[in-house]
Amino acid sequence: MKNVTHSFVFLAHWPSAGSFGLNTDILATNLINLTVVVGVLIFFGKGVLKDLLDNRKQRILSTIRNSEELRRGTFEQLEKARIRLQKVELEADEYRMNGYSEIEREKENLINATSISLEQLEKSKNETLYFEKQRAMNQVRQRVFQQAVQGALGTLNSCLNTELHFRTIRANIGILGSMEWKR
């Protein structure tokens, strides 16, 4: 890593009398300088982005595992409900003479309650996955935006010098002065 940095420093200070060298003026860069800068950014930035994406991947996988556990629990509840349904059906056969319609209503209520519970759990799982995905995408967008803003600020700060500041201030004073004369 240190050798790579020293080689770039060496190239930047190489005499430019008709030979190859790095142009450090960002506004007058050529294709080779841009290629070197982009290459360095890709080389050093891909590790950070890869780590960020790996962390998000692990969180999403964890959420999926949790959802799968919820699904398994739901299936266990469904199996218990089926066993209970079988029990209710057996009792229905025994009490058919005494209250067939009441038992049938209880059976339908049990099936409906189980179905509603399953739908709610499935909906909850899908919403959790959707929100985790959205949160992951928003965090990645925010990180990329922050890095872009930091890079832009760094570029602007490196391009601005004292003379440019004074020219800008003088131009703005001239504009304000002409506005005062118009009143």
UniProtKB/Swiss-Prot annotation:
Main location: plastid
Record field: transmembrane: 27-49
Any one GO cellular component localisation term in the record: chloroplast thylakoid membrane
Disulfide bonds: none
Molecular function GO labels: proton-transporting ATP synthase activity, rotational mechanism
UniProt entry keywords in alphabetical sequence: ATP synthesis, CF(0), Chloroplast, Hydrogen ion transport, Ion transport, Membrane, Plastid, Thylakoid, Transmembrane, Transmembrane helix, Transport
CDD domains: ATP-synt_Fo_b
Membrane topology category: Single-pass membrane protein
Presence of the UniProt keyword Ion transport in the record: yes
Subcellular location: Plastid, Chloroplast thylakoid membrane
Record-stated family: Belongs to the ATPase B chain family.
Role summary: F(1)F(0) ATP synthase produces ATP from ADP in the presence of a proton or sodium gradient. F-type ATPases consist of two structural domains, F(1) containing the extramembraneous catalytic core and F(0) containing the membrane proton channel, linked together by a central stalk and a peripheral stalk. During catalysis, ATP synthesis in the catalytic domain of F(1) is coupled via a rotary mechanism of the central stalk subunits to proton translocation. Component of the F(0) channel, it forms part of the peripheral stalk, linking F(1) to F(0).
Subunit structure: F-type ATPases have 2 components, F(1) - the catalytic core - and F(0) - the membrane proton channel. F(1) has five subunits: alpha(3), beta(3), gamma(1), delta(1), epsilon(1). F(0) has four main subunits: a(1), b(1), b'(1) and c(10-14). The alpha and beta chains form an alternating ring which encloses part of the gamma chain. F(1) is attached to F(0) by a central stalk formed by the gamma and epsilon chains, while a peripheral stalk is formed by the delta, b and b' chains.
Misc. remarks from the entry: In plastids the F-type ATPase is also known as CF(1)CF(0).
The protein's name in its UniProt record: ATP synthase subunit b, chloroplastic
Gene name in the database record: atpF
